[in-house]
UniProtKB/Swiss-Prot annotation:
Keyword Hydrolase appears in the UniProt entry: no
Keyword Thylakoid appears in the UniProt entry: yes
InterPro entries: PS_antenna-like, PS_II_antenna-like_sf, PSII_PsbB
One term under GO cellular component: photosystem II
Keywords: Chlorophyll, Chloroplast, Chromophore, Membrane, Photosynthesis, Photosystem II, Plastid, Thylakoid, Transmembrane, Transmembrane helix
Name used for this protein in its record: Photosystem II CP47 reaction center protein
Membrane topology: Multi-pass membrane protein
Main localization, broad class: plastid
Biological source species: Carica papaya (Papaya)
GO biological-process terms attached to the record: photosynthetic electron transport in photosystem II
Cofactor detail note: Binds multiple chlorophylls. PSII binds additional chlorophylls, carotenoids and specific lipids.
Localization of this protein: Plastid, Chloroplast thylakoid membrane
SUPFAM superfamilies: Photosystem II antenna protein-like (SSF161077)
Gene: psbB
Length: 508
């Protein structure tokens, strides 16, 4: 046929059988990728330390999505929450991966069958004998079926009525587990961080989809609307489908980047805004203050801070710190976290407690500045020592650790104090193993960052695709050069411009 690469999809125009075939093959490719990727991730995933080396630090992409839907066990005998299990059941990580691969194979065979047997009676209009699809009816069928699936997910899977529930955690990502969720029908259901909204919105949207599907199955579109929106043209279906996909991609890019109940931080890592706002730092200080109010010592209060909470309060877990072209997991960047060294408290020679100013998200380097409780600069690590007034040596800064591995240890020599002051810029201080993976020390993003970038990019691309195909279907007559009001029978090839009698071809 000699089609250019950007026109090859015209081969399935007016060929419903092969149009169906290529869509089934696409589903086979997607399901096959998902299953294969899951098996690859399971082969390289280390489940031994869910606190300091969780799935998002290891760069897992599909495991978090399985986990949030209720899969927690592996045929390898481990559970995502730690510990061992003896009977993981069919719906383990490997079971889901295998199901996708089997489904992919069946779709592959179905696609081949429909490609070979493309000329089926069901695709033909009995009045004309030509291939024809009743697109409004097909729209109604798809709307109804997707409504049933949506309702079923919300009413059965999420609520635990028939299914495991979903991943639910506390606001600080410490106690997450899979559990049934009751629908939230009040105003709280509109809070993106309330899991009950997931159940209620799927039930409501599914009900609406079922009703809308039945409507479109039982009511024919008015002729004027049918013609105006080109409802008989398959490119209209393409355009509106692309619109649905890019809209969904923009929405999930937002819920992933800003955080929501659908993207728990235990599975995808914290958001950048939790670092920007000192979210975990405030909670840590609140817990320490509560401990001190109960007459605990500083050491006791800091020792009760969960290592998991302290680890969230570390800039290396901020998804916005990874560069756009830095491939690899977070562990390949700053290393595998081994342990929390403890919270450093700096003091000058007058006994004032000093706080290291933390590095903002979009800085690669930042001056080491220590301020007192009133925000007044008391010490720093100067760029030019000759002009320094607040150097660690001049001010006599010391550091003492509370909680963690260095609990009760203090340092007064300036070199060590400066080392820990620099590290305190990055939040809580952790020992990181950079040797095992040959980590290069340059921060990487988490799957939260990759997902957002990928979906925002494709959403923009698909937005232009929607405009392109929408314009092609709405203005098809203009592009083809056919007057829509032309009633006369037009002989193809008689005119240079189709249907324009002023351009009759001259016989040479």
């Amino acid at each position: 046929m000699g089609l250019p690469w950007y026109r090859v999809h015209t081969v399935v125009l007016n060929d419903p059988g092969r149009l169906l075939s290529v869509h089934i093959m696409h589903t086979a490719l997607v399901a096959g990728w998902a299953g294969s990727m899951a098996l690859y991730e399971l082969a390289v995933f280390d489940p031994s330390d869910p606190v300091l080396d969780p799935m998002w630090r290891q760069g897992m992409f599909v495991i978090p999505f399985m986990t949030r839907l209720g899969i927690t066990n592996s045929w390898g005998g481990w559970s995502i929450t730690g510990g061992t299990i003896t009977n993981p059941g069919l719906w383990s990580y490997e079971g889901v991966a295998g199901a996708h691969i089997v489904f992919s194979g069946l779709c592959f065979l179905a696609a081949i069958w429909h490609w070979v047997y493309w000329d089926l009676e069901i695709f033909c209009d009995e009045r004309t004998g030509k291939p024809s699809l009743d697109l409004p009816k097909i729209f109604g069928i798809h709307l109804f079926l997707s409504g049933v699936a949506c309702f079923g997910f919300g009413a059965f899977h999420v609520t635990g009525l028939y299914g495991p529930g979903i991943w639910v955690s506390d606001p600080y990502g410490l106690t997450g587990k899979v559990q049934p969720v009751n629908p939230a029908w009040g105003v709280e259901g509109f809070d993106p961080f309330v899991p009950g909204g997931i159940a209620s919105h799927h039930i409501a949207a599914g009900t609406l989809g079922i009703l809308a599907g039945l409507f479109h199955l039982s009511v024919r579109p008015p002729q004027r609307l049918y013609k105006g929106l080109r409802m008989g043209n398959i490119e209209t279906v393409l355009s509106s489908s692309i619109a649905a996909v890019f809209f969904a991609a923009f929405v999930v890019a937002g819920t992933m980047w800003y955080g929501s109940a659908t993207t728990p931080i235990e599975l995808f890592g914290p958001t950048r805004y939790q670092w920007d706002q000192g979210y975990f730092q405030q909670e840590i200080y609140r817990r320490v203050s509560a401990g001190l109010a109960e007459n605990q010592s500083l050491s006791e209060a800091w020792s009760k801070i969960p290592e998991k909470l302290a680890f969230y309060d570390y800039i290396g877990n901020n998804p916005a710190k990874g560069g756009l072209f830095r491939a690899g997991s977070m562990d390949n960047g700053d290393g595998i976290a081994v342990g929390w060294l403890g919270h450093p408290i700096f003091r000058d020679k007058e006994g004032r407690e000093l706080f290291v100013r933390r590095m903002p998200t979009f800085f690669e380097t930042f001056p080491v500045v220590l301020v007192d409780g009133d925000g007044i600069v008391r010490a720093d690590v100067p760029f030019r020592r000759a002009e320094s007034k607040y150097s660690v040596e001049q001010v006599g800064v010391t550091v003492e650790f509370y909680g963690g591995e260095l609990n009760g240890v203090s340092y007064s020599d300036p070199a060590t104090v400066k080392k820990y002051a620099r590290r305190a810029q990055l939040g809580e201080i952790f020992e990181l193993d950079r040797a095992t993976l040959k980590s290069d020390g340059v921060f990487r993003s988490s799957p939260r960052g990759w997902f957002t970038f990928g979906h925002a990019s494709f959403a923009l691309l698909f937005f232009f695709g929607h405009i392109w195909h929408g314009a092609r279907t709405l203005f098809r007559d203009v592009f083809a050069g056919i007057d829509p009001d032309l009633d006369a029978q037009v002989e193809f090839g008689a005119f240079q411009k189709l249907g324009d009698p002023t351009t009759r071809r001259q016989v040479v």
